[in-house]
UniProtKB/Swiss-Prot annotation:
InterPro entries named in the record: Amidohydro-rel, Metal-dep_hydrolase_composite, Metal_Hydrolase, Urease_alpha_N_dom, Urease_alpha_subunit, Urease_AS, Urease_asu, Urease_asu_c
Lineage: Bacteria, Bacillati, Actinomycetota, Actinomycetes, Mycobacteriales
GO BP, sorted A to Z: urea catabolic process
Name of the protein in question: Urease subunit alpha
Residues the record lists as binding Ni(2+) 1: H141, H143, K224, D367
Length: 577
């Protein structure tokens, strides 16, 4: 019996079990561990669309109607990279949700077809063969300073935004907060027409519980405590007390100046309760110099932001000016300058690299336009993984060798911007992974451009953003090929395929009838019992110590030496600027 070579099979149908794929121009490789949609022994039976190919009437396409269960869309032959594994499969989408991950086609003439992947006349096909699919990214730290930030986010593969703001107001430029019911209503209305899921954070800096409850009834999904509004132990305790009663998450940017207490006082105020600590490395803010030690605690869900990812020879130089602008500081005031300089510590930034690699810092966000870049969350995550592989070699459980697969490292790092923030904020019943039942928020990548620019962004089953050529060309591919909004980004479709995540109290208060939005309001799940152990593949709790004089960081007793990277992948090979 004639058999295809692995090379030829990959050319025709995409890679299969045992094949390895390089991610962009990094040193990272992933290996397909399972092929649910074919394989070399089944060549010719794979679901492939095109002239003379399988998915034609009475061949790979059957007669089943949509009413009889045919999926609306099938993504064929995609390599899925998710926290739970790296496999190849066809992905079925129906009513904007993932309904099956397996083998698609016509069971009348094909074997092994998943019952929810029977292709019919009502089924659209997205070619995933030779491409990678990941869950839509979740940016857990977004300042909503301008609406254009949403387009940048979508163009990088982000489909869910957690954060706050009201536009270019001083409060929003410094803090990820949408304060009060009026602002929450206006922002929910403003964001209704964008194809992204939204979870707004209300202002948590108060000791008045009534002011917190009214924000939950007004559409907040949780709270943000920020030092620029005063993150005192009393405010932390009051906010967490209401959060415990409401079941929502609290994000904390703690007191850099240690005016209201030290890191020990903040931990005492938290009192073992679940909390998401922003800027856990400290460069973006938080108790100087030892906020990074909170990553060792079982109740703390730590994240850091992308301007310090990874530590390079340029990281320190760009941070001082960023800090002065973002926190409304005056370089002519010595105290303001000292405040800025106290936060930029190369030793803790370097330690951030290692803590991400061992899974001790669980999440990465952008801090968009407030010391971070919303379009670089995905890219800088994988740059960090690359740098750590170069420095530390294979991760535990991965084989060693130049061309060995890095599946465990890939799964850990993809989790940092997908499932981990979803779990932390109570969104994982809807988003955060490529799993049956969840919203079909999916990103397709050409392997050579993985993490750099998506091939297409599917939002709730509709293509919302894609790499597209000249619209006046005779075919879709002529230059310039740019990330462009697609029909799924039109306001009516965006509202139909996206959700606003809100506290359950706003649903009970009838918020949907009080604001002008067309999308569903979805209550966040109760997160008050969520701890570090619930962060998939990112649950490490090492002992972390910071010398108060030298800022030297010890992790499990070992000093992590600074070796800032001098060259990165996913950079000038892809971008002119």
């Amino acid at each position: 019996m004639a058999r295809l070579s692995r090379e030829r099979y990959a050319q025709l149908y995409g890679p299969t079990t045992g094949d390895r794929i390089r991610l962009a121009d990094t040193d990272l490789l992933v290996e397909i561990t399972e092929d649910r949609c074919g394989g070399p022994g089944l060549a010719g039976d794979e679901a492939v669309f095109g002239g003379g190919k399988v998915l034609r009437e009475s061949m790979g396409q059957g007669r089943v109607t949509r009413a009889e269960g045919a999926p609306d869309t099938v993504i064929t032959g995609a390599v899925i990279i998710d926290y739970w594994g790296i496999i190849k499969a066809d992905i079925g989408i129906r009513d904007g949700r993932i309904v099956a991950i397996g083998k698609a086609g016509n069971p009348n003439i094909m074997s092994g077809i998943h019952p929810d992947l029977v292709v019919g006349p009502s089924t659209e096909i997205i070619g995933g063969n030779g491409r990678i699919v990941t869950a839509g990214a979740i940016d857990c730290h977004v300042h909503l300073i301008c609406p254009q930030v949403i387009a940048e986010a979508l163009g990088s593969g982000i489909t869910t935004i957690i954060g706050g703001g009201t536009g270019p107001a001083e409060g929003s430029k410094s803090t990820t907060v949408t304060p009060g019911g009026w602002h929450l209503a206006r922002m929910l209305e403003a964001l209704d027409s964008w194809p992204v899921n939204i979870a707004l954070l209300g202002k948590g800096n108060t000791v008045n519980p009534d002011a917190l409850w009214e924000q939950l009834r007004g559409g907040a999904s949780g709270f943000k405590l920020h030092e620029d509004w005063g993150s005192s132990p009393a405010a932390i305790d009051a906010c967490l007390t209401v959060a415990d009663a409401a079941g929502v998450q609290v994000a904390l940017h703690s007191d850099t100046l240690n005016e209201m207490g030290f890191v020990e006082d903040t931990l005492a105020a938290i009192a073992g309760r679940s909390i998401h600590t922003y800027h856990t490395e400290g460069a973006g803010g938080g108790h100087a110099p030892d906020i990074i030690t909170v990553a060792a605690h079982p109740n703390v869900l730590p994240s850091s932001t992308n301007p310090t990812r990874p530590h390079t020879v340029n990281t320190l130089d760009e941070h001082l000016d960023m800090l002065m602008v973002c926190h409304h500081l005056n370089p002519r005031i010595p105290e303001d300058l000292a405040f800025a300089e106290s936060r930029i510590r190369p030793s803790t930034i370097a330690a951030e690299d290692l803590l991400h690699d061992i899974g001790a810092i669980s999440m990465i966000g952008s801090d968009s336009q407030a010391m971070g870049r919303v379009g670089e969350v995905v890219m800088r995550t994988w740059q960090t993984a690359h740098v750590m592989k170069q420095r530390r070699g294979a991760l535990e459980g991965d084989p060693s060798g130049r061309y060995s697969a890095d599946n465990n490292r890939a799964r850990r790092y993809v989790a940092k911007y997908t499932i981990c923030p979803a779990v932390a904020h109570g969104l994982d019943h809807e988003v955060g992974s490529v799993e049956v039942g969840k919203l079909a928020d999916l990103v397709l990548w050409e392997p050579a451009f993985f993490g750099v620019r998506p091939h297409a962004v599917v939002k709730g089953g509709a293509i919302a953003w894609a790499a597209m050529g000249d619209a006046n060309a005779s075919i879709p591919t002529p230059q310039p090929v740019l990330p462009r909004p697609m029909f799924g980004a039109s306001p009516a479709v965006a509202a139909a395929t996206s959700v606003h995540f809100v506290a359950a109290q706003s649903i009970e208060a009838g918020l949907a009838d009080q604001i002008a939005v067309d999308r569903r309001l979805v209550p966040v799940a109760d997160v008050r019992a969520v701890g570090k152990a619930d962060m998939p593949l990112n649950d490490a709790q090492p002992r972390i110590e910071v010398d108060p004089d030298t800022f030297t960081v010890r992790i499990d007793g070992e000093v992590w030496e600074q070796q800032p990277a001098t060259e990165l992948p996913m950079a000038q090979r892809y971008f002119l600027f």
